[in-house]
Design a protein with these regions (language model features):
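Inter-lobe coupling linker of SF2 helicases/translocases
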Residues: 70-85, 105-111, 115, 120, ...
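A short helix-turn-beta junction within AAA+ P-loop NTPase domains corresponding to the substrate/partner-engaging
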Residues: 133-146
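Walker B catalytic acidic pair
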Residues: 94-95
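ATP-binding Walker
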Residues: 2
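Conserved helicase motor
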Residues: 50-58, 73-78, 102-103
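Conserved SF1/SF2 helicase motif Ia
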Residues: 7-37
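Conserved motor-coupling elements within RecA-like helicase/translocase cores
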Residues: 56-69
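Conserved helix-turn-beta segment of the N-terminal RecA-like "Helicase ATP-binding" lobe
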Residues: 32-54
């Protein structure tokens, strides 16, 4: 089928050409930065920059008028710590399953990217815990599943020690998420 990278680039270009976005930040594993750069150049002809180097240089790079900026998850987390936040009109997060644990440094930093549009890509389904699904969905639309305490009360069954023993209302969560997912 049409790859997730090409679909994300297509969505970004559609928004860019209709003037909804000017700056697009791609956050991906280090090993994929140059692949993303190559694909963006191949399909768009837009200017592309890989955000790398020392932190003071990277801080300036985020303010460059380049259309596409590409950064690794670890660099993004360090930069958010240094800058407080990162701004972009659109963010594309590749291999988003890396953010499945809500309270990790990288997941916390990812939530501090200010963007009007967020696209989360994964070729690996989240299979283990509903809490992991919440973490990823919260990046896409923080209002979709509500605050975590409400989510936990509505969908998670725990024992007397607060250990998760099962899940409930899965059809409801499926309906809410289906409006935001392409499988």
């Amino acid at each position: 089928g049409l790859g997730k990278t090409v679909q994300a680039i297509g969505a970004a270009e559609l928004l860019r050409r209709h003037k909804f976005v000017e700056s697009i930040l791609v956050v991906c594993p280090t090993s994929l930065k140059y692949q993303w750069k190559s694909e963006i150049e191949r399909f768009t002809g837009a200017d592309v920059m890989i955000v790398e180097g020392v932190v003071t240089k990277r801080a300036l790079m985020y303010n460059e008028p380049t259309t596409y900026k590409i950064v690794s998850y670890h660099t993004m987390a360090n930069d958010v710590r240094y800058l407080g936040h990162i701004d972009a009109d659109m963010v594309i997060m590749d291999e988003v399953q890396r953010l499945k644990n809500w309270n990790t440094i990288i997941a916390t930093a990812a939530r501090r990217i200010n963007a009007r549009y967020t696209v989360a890509l994964s070729g690996t389904p989240l299979e283990n815990k509903l809490e992991e699904f919440y973490s990823v969905m919260e990046l896409i639309d923080q209002y979709c599943l509500g605050p975590y305490y409400e989510f936990r009360n509505k969908y998670i069954v725990t024992d007397s020690t607060a250990k998760v023993i099962s899940y409930k209302n899965l059809n409801d969560i499926g309906k809410k998420a289906s409006e935001r997912l392409i499988r």
